[in-house]
C-alpha cells in the first residue's frame, strides 16, 4: 500500500519514532544505573547498622554491665524504701481510722507529711535545680537569669498541671446521686477529727471522698517523677565511680525513708488500706529504674543535667500542690491544733523539715 503523500503525516511519524528511541535509551540508562544506586544504599545501610551495633555493644560491654547492675540495684533500693512505712504504721491503723483516736493519729502523720513535702521542695529539689542551672551557664549573667526564670516557670507549670489533673479526674468520676451511700472509713475519720455515727450519704461528702482518692493518685504521680530524678542521680554517680554511686544511694535513702512515711500517710488519708498503699508506693520505683536507664543510655552528663533542670522544679510544683491544697486544709480544720503535736502546733512539720536539712547539706 503506498504511503500517505501528506507531509504532516510524515513529520508526525518521525516525531513518534524519535520519542520512542529516546524513551528506550532512558530506560536502558536507568536500568544500568539501578545496581549502582542499590549498592550505594546498601553501603549506607551497612554503615548505619555498624554504628548502631557499636553503640549497643558499648552499652552492653563488660565495663558498662557493672554500671547497669549497680545503677538498677541502687534505684530499686530507693524504690523499696516506699515499703518501709509498713514497719512503722501499726497493723490496726486501717480500722483505727473509724475512731476519733485514729483520726487524731492520722492528723499527726499528715502534719509529718506536710513538713516532708515542704522540706523536700525547699531544701532538696529547688536547691539542686538551682545548682544545675548555675553549672549549665556559669559566668554568663543574662543566660543565668533566664534559666532561673525558667526554673520558676517550671514550678508554676507543675502546680497548674496537678491542678488541671485533679479537676479532670474529678469531672471524670462524677457519681450518680442515686448511688449507694459511701462506706469509706476515711470519710468518717477526716470529718474535722470527729467520728461519724452513720455512713456518709450526702452527695457533698461523697465528693470529698472522690477528692481524697484523686489527691492520693496525684501524690503517686509526683513521687514517680521524683524517683525518676533519683534514678538519674544514682546512675550518673555510678558512671563516675562505684564509691560515689554508693554514697549517693545512701544519701537518697536517708532522705527518702522519712519522706515515704509521710507519703504513706497521704495514701491512708486517701482511703487505701496498708497493703494497697505499700503496693502503690512500690510501683513508683518504676520511675527510678527508667531514670537510671535513661542516664546510662545517654552517657552524657550534659544530657542528664538538661533533663534534671526541668524535672526537679516541675516535681516541686506538684509537691507544693499536694501539700498546700490537699494536706494543709485538713490540718487547718482541726478544732484543737494543740493535739496535733503538743506542745507546739507546728512542731511535727518543723521537725520533719529539720530531718531533711542535714541530708540536703
UniProtKB/Swiss-Prot annotation:
A molecular function (GO) term: protein homodimerization activity
Transmembrane segments: 7-27, 69-89, 109-129, 151-171, 234-254, 277-297, 308-328, 341-361
Superkingdom of origin organism: Eukaryota
Annotated GO biological process: brown fat cell differentiation; connective tissue development; intracellular zinc ion homeostasis; response to zinc ion; zinc ion transmembrane transport; zinc ion transport
Ranges in the topological domain labelled Lumenal: 1-6, 90-108, 172-233, 298-307
InterPro entries: ZIP
One Pfam family cited in the UniProt record for this chain: Zip
Localization per record: Golgi apparatus membrane; Cytoplasmic vesicle membrane; Endoplasmic reticulum membrane
Membrane topology value: Multi-pass membrane protein
Position of sequence motif XEXPHE-motif: 255-260
Main location class: Golgi
Topological domain spans for side Cytoplasmic: 28-68, 130-150, 255-276, 329-340
UniProt keyword annotations, A-Z: Cytoplasmic vesicle, Endoplasmic reticulum, Golgi apparatus, Ion transport, Membrane, Transmembrane, Transmembrane helix, Transport, Zinc, Zinc transport
Summary of the function given for this chain in its UniProt record: Functions as a zinc transporter transporting Zn(2+) from the Golgi apparatus to the cytosol and thus influences the zinc level at least in areas of the cytosol. May regulate beige adipocyte differentiation.
Family: Belongs to the ZIP transporter (TC 2.A.5) family.
Subunit composition and interactions: Homodimer.
Protein name: Zinc transporter ZIP13
Gene encoding the protein: Slc39a13
Amino acid at each position: 500500500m503506498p504511503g500517505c503523500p501528506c507531509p504532516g503525516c510524515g513529520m508526525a511519524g518521525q516525531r513518534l519514532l524519535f520519542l520512542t528511541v529516546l524513551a528506550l535509551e532512558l530506560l536502558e540508562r536507568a536500568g544500568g544505573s539501578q545496581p549502582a544506586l542499590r549498592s550505594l544504599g546498601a553501603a549506607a545501610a551497612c554503615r548505619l547498622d555498624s554504628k548502631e551495633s557499636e553503640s549497643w555493644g558499648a552499652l552492653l560491654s563488660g565495663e558498662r554491665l557493672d554500671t547497669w547492675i549497680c545503677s538498677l540495684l541502687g534505684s530499686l533500693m530507693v524504690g523499696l524504701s516506699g515499703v518501709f512505712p509498713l514497719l512503722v504504721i501499726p497493723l490496726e491503723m486501717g480500722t483505727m481510722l473509724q475512731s476519733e483516736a485514729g483520726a487524731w493519729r492520722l492528723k499527726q502523720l499528715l502534719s509529718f507529711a506536710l513538713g516532708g513535702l515542704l522540706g523536700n521542695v525547699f531544701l532538696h529539689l529547688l536547691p539542686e535545680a538551682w545548682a544545675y542551672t548555675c553549672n549549665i551557664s556559669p559566668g554568663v549573667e543574662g543566660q543565668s537569669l533566664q534559666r532561673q526564670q525558667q526554673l520558676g516557670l517550671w514550678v508554676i507549670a507543675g502546680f497548674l498541671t496537678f491542678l488541671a489533673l485533679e479537676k479532670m479526674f474529678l469531672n471524670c468520676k462524677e457519681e450518680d446521686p442515686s448511688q449507694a451511700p459511701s462506706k469509706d472509713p476515711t470519710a468518717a475519720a477526716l470529718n474535722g477529727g470527729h467520728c461519724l455515727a452513720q455512713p456518709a450519704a450526702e452527695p457533698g461528702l461523697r465528693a470529698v471522698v472522690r477528692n481524697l482518692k484523686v489527691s492520693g493518685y496525684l501524690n503517686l504521680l509526683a513521687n514517680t517523677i521524683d524517683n525518676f530524678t533519683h534514678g538519674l542521680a544514682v546512675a550518673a554517680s555510678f558512671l563516675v565511680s562505684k564509691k560515689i554511686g554508693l554514697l549517693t544511694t545512701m544519701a537518697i535513702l536517708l532522705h527518702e525513708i522519712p519522706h515515704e512515711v509521710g507519703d504513706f500517710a497521704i495514701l491512708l488519708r486517701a482511703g487505701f488500706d496498708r497493703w494497697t498503699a505499700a503496693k502503690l508506693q512500690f510501683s513508683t520505683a518504676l520511675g527510678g529504674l527508667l531514670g537510671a536507664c535513661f542516664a546510662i543510655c545517654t552517657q552524657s552528663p550534659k544530657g542528664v543535667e538538661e533533663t534534671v533542670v526541668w524535672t526537679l522544679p516541675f516535681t516541686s510544683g506538684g509537691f507544693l500542690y499536694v501539700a498546700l491544697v490537699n494536706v494543709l486544709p485538713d490540718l487547718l480544720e482541726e478544732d484543737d491544733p494543740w493535739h496535733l503535736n503538743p506542745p507546739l502546733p507546728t512542731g511535727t512539720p518543723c521537725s520533719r523539715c529539720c530531718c531533711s536539712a542535714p541530708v540536703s547539706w
